[in-house]
Amino acid sequence: PLSNEDVAKYLTAVRECIESEQILRNAFGISEFKPTAFEIETAVAMLAFFDKECDVCVLETGLGGRWDATNAIDDKVLSIITPIGLDHCALLGNTLGEIASEKAAITKDVVVTCAQPGEVIEQIKNPYDIKDGKKEYRKANVVVCKEPKFLRGNLDGQVFSYDGKEYEISMLGKHQLVNASIAICAVGELRKKHFSIDDNALEKGLKNTVWKARLQVVKNAKEEFNITIPQDKVLVFDGSHNPQGATTLANAIKDLFKNKRVHLVLGILKDKDVKGICTILAPLANRITCITPPSPRAMQKEELKCIVAPLCKGECSMQDDIKTAVQNALNGDCDVTILCGSLTLFSELKTNE
């Protein structure tokens, strides 16, 4: 990770560029220049990659697709499209096909993906660019990875087989087996382009990869967040914020916490499919505490409670403070506490240490 000093240095450089651009715009009477937070973060990443002389850079899109900040980079060796769900609908479209069409616009050369609905694969195979206001279609070289086979797992990770070989990952959820399989397939395509990646590096990378706030079983809550986890209790962080992500969380609850009492501490942004998320998760909870995420786009806890309470089989309450809500849930009568619904929840935990 970058040091605080490096982040400050790169942010300062980006700010100076933004200010210079605004001066020019003011001189010519052009509209105000307002880059988004993600655009600024992408610029910071580009400076870091250049400054650190990285050989290979992996860029993850924001909302993904044609208008994504990362699409400013033309020199792409490989593009990867993970399972597509209904998210960012206001910007990308209301169907899987429409969303896939926008996401596919960012791809270049070889595209690695997994088994997806036919309408999605069709769009990935036939992306288009917009030039002079017209659509120009092109053919993409699409590689679909093979299906993984789950072998065994616990709260520390999973073992699966892919193409006849066993691999281990530390992340939870059957969907991560698909993501890992895409990564293995992508490495195979990079090798065809003469990238030297040996099997040991691949296996080590898969095993050591962690993704905070994605079905994360929290081990060091006291040190990081000043939260105490009682003995025999489990704390999980999950930032999934659409029905697709809620389904993966629901499946994990059924797989990993069968016959356990579950307390959800839930906060969701109002521009998400709140009812869809709640319909999937609420019936699995013995208790739910509604909170308001730290965002101007947040759904207020009172409104969320009105939606989720009829779906919950147990008590549904509200709490003002996120950390207090989590600690109270851990101290209660449920075995598993899951803080979920939005990635914004976890930044609040860190800032309120």
Please describe what each predicted stretch is.
Residues 54, 76, 107-109, 285, ...:
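Short, well-ordered alpha-helix to beta-strand connector turns
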Residues 152-165:
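Acidic-glycine-rich active-site phosphate/pyrophosphate-binding loop
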Residues 343-353:
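Glycine/aspartate-rich loop-and-adjacent alpha/beta segment that forms the canonical ThDP
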